[in-house]
Amino acid sequence: MNVLEQVIENRYALYNGDSCEIAKAIPDNSIHYTIFSPPFASLYTYSNSDRDMGNSKGDDEFYNHFIFLAKELYRVTMPGRLLSFHCMDLPLMKERDGVIGLKDFPAIIRQIFEDCGFIYHSKVTIWKNPVTEMQRTKALGLLHKQIRKDSTMNRQGIPDYIITLRKPGENPERVSHTHESFPVNVWQNYASPVWMDIRQSDTLQKKLARDDKDERHICPLQLEVIQRCIELWTNPNDIVLDPFAGIGSVPYTAVKMGRRGIGVELKESYYNQAVNNLEIAVKGDVMECPVGQMSIEDFLTANPA
């Protein structure tokens, strides 16, 4: 396994490296749940690495690279268990794409996973304020002056989505809740097809993960989104994987909720911040392991405290 750095503690494992390579070292049917936000093709530049999927020359190259990871994620997921990804429709720009419009990026990623064998399970729309989007992007379709000019070019804002897929087979470890631990009013909120109450600012501190030499966008998942998915679809001590861990939002939340987390991140500054965040999550000393000292298999079979 080609790992640049790694930190392993009894509740989590973080790897600085290429998720396509590191996923190959994860045993079959060993991951209880995966949740992540995929790179948005060529929309953002996350790092300068030629291994970064976000640096693909075009959509076809990105999708071809992503298929390799999707196949590995199918292999490592336990039968009957779930994988969720967080993304949005992508804007088409006149100067880059030749037209103004939208690309259904979530549907393309979902189809890749279905082609690997996953079953489409559910979809949640996460409301986002269109005024904030307009102020940030100055998108033509959201400008009020366009209403006065020609409103056929106006559109609604772009929400986020959580799309969840299930691996076929019988779940060997059922996820069960009690009325007390998961009351009906909570379930009614989670069962809504639209989550209206997610605060976009509800993320881990990301300032320290920026490189001055990079351009550079970081798009951490909102903590409340991660919490809801983990609460609904996992048991305590389950292993939660994020192959694009960024600053560690998913493993951080998993550990705080009594689960175990695996995070893989290619960019060094993001990885280093993830290490700091996980140290905060466990509130104790972590065991730093030189590359090659402990395998993923060792972590998966360890008896958690």
Cite the ranges covered by each PLM segment.
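Core catalytic lobe of class I
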Residues: N2-Q273, I296, A305
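Class I S-adenosyl-L-methionine-dependent methyltransferase module
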Residues: I108-I109, V275-A305
